[in-house]
């Protein structure tokens, strides 16, 4: 591929759209996992109750259950007909704008259940927005741009966490919480601007015409395109590709503590040594995939993941040293960024654009299984 074509693949409108889709996806999630717990604790809510709030994340796991609706039905908005994908984007973003702003007007001590239900609603809307943004991205990106486009999306998703996780927390020291949540919800407007400024993707494939077809056809399409044996091999690959990485990082913080590092050391070093190498790895991986393709990237980046995990063994052998902790974490998350870039691109390529909402949601739910199992069983394996 010549350099002009490479520049065109990097510097185009589709990549700009991927920045906005990533930011729009990440914002609501980080409101729930970063800002809401800090708000509740500041207002005097107990750790037990705050811990139970993690259950509001269930819609992200089970989003595949209603994903066929997004492949079948569009939402009419009075006289405005934005189309199948954009109607869901616009509806979820408008509701997210309102519901996130509403949080700050409730008292955590006297309205905790109302807050819990409202947060569950935000999680449902956010998961639904994720479904449609994944589908939209799959439809607008040609296969050769899936790697870079999805890398940009994932990194913008992570950077979005700096708004509720950093900016909003800083503002809360100077402003009342109701203003903080209104300001935070204002960042949802970036997603709305995106939705209003883009066009509905053109589809070369026939969309399902009945709800039954929207549920059954994605499965039939996947197994008929790949063949039963190949389909099961692909699903097994999706389950296993990130398993080692998940197991290596599942108990990382307890491991650092056992090695003698203080919580301050871990907080300062881990935060800075993880985020930016992961972002650099994701962007570099996306650009490399334009040159080498997704299949070769899976092998190459997978090897980097394996080597980076060995850093934990080096840390265990050599022992304490902040420079070593930063080096090990940085290299590990560089591998995470590279591997995630290739893996998400592979998942996107495996989907059929006609059933992108359902298949993408199913595949991403499947890939969450080994991460959950790793978190639960890694400690047992070390006994």
Please report, for each region that a protein language model flagged, where it lies by residue.
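Symmetry-related core transmembrane helices of the 12-TM Major Facilitator Superfamily/SLC fold
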Residues: 91-97, 179-197
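Loop-to-transmembrane helix entry/capping segments in MFS-fold secondary transporters
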Residues: 47-48, 143-152, 263-264, 353-363
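Helix-to-loop junctions at the C-terminal end of transmembrane segments
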Residues: 63-82, 280-297, 382-383
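C-terminal ends and interior cores of transmembrane alpha-helices
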Residues: 87-109, 303-320
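Juxtamembrane intracellular "pre-TM" segments in multi-pass secondary transporters
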Residues: 2-11, 200-234
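C-terminal transmembrane helical hairpin of 12-TM major facilitator-type secondary transporters
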Residues: 296-343
């Amino acid at each position: 591929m010549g350099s002009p074509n490479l520049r065109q693949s990097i510097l185009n409108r589709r990549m700009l759209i991927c920045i906005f889709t990533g930011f729009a996806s990440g914002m609501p999630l980080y409101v729930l996992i970063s800002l809401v717990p800090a708000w509740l604790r500041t207002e005097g809510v107990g750790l037990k109750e705050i811990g139970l709030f993690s259950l509001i994340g269930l819609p992200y796991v089970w989003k595949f259950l209603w994903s066929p609706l997004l492949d079948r039905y569009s939402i009419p908005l009075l006289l405005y007909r934005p189309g199948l994908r954009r109607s869901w984007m616009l509806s979820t973003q408008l509701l997210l704008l309102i519901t996130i702003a509403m949080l700050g007007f409730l008292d955590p001590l006297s309205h905790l259940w109302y807050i819990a239900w409202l947060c569950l609603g935000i999680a449902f809307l956010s998961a639904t927005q994720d479904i449609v943004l994944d589908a939209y991205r799959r439809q607008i990106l040609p296969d050769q741009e899936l790697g870079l486009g999805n890398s940009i999306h994932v990194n913008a998703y992570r950077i979005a966490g700096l708004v509720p996780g950093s900016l909003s927390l800083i503002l809360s020291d100077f402003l009342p919480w109701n203003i903080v949540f209104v300001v935070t919800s204002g960042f949802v407007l970036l997603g709305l601007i995106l939705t209003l400024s883009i066009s509905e993707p053109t589809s070369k494939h026939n969309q399902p015409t009945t709800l039954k077809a929207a549920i059954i056809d994605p499965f039939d399409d996947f197994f008929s395109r790949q063949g039963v044996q190949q389909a099961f091999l692909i699903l097994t690959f999706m389950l296993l590709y990130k398993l080692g990485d998940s197991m290596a990082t599942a108990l990382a913080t307890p491991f650092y503590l056992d090695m003698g590092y203080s919580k301050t050391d871990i907080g300062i070093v881990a935060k800075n040594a993880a985020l930016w190498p992961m972002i650099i790895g994701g962007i570099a991986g996306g650009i490399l995939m334009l040159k080498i393709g997704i299949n070769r990237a899976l092998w190459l980046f997978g090897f980097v993941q394996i080597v980076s995990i060995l850093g934990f063994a080096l840390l265990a052998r050599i022992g304490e040293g902040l420079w070593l902790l930063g080096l090990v974490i940085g290299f590990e998350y560089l591998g995470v960024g590279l591997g995630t870039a290739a893996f998400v691109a592979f998942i996107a390529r495996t989907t059929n654009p006609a059933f992108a909402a359902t298949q993408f949601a199913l595949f991403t739910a499947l890939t969450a299984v080994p991460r959950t199992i790793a978190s639960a069983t890694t400690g047992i394996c070390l006994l």
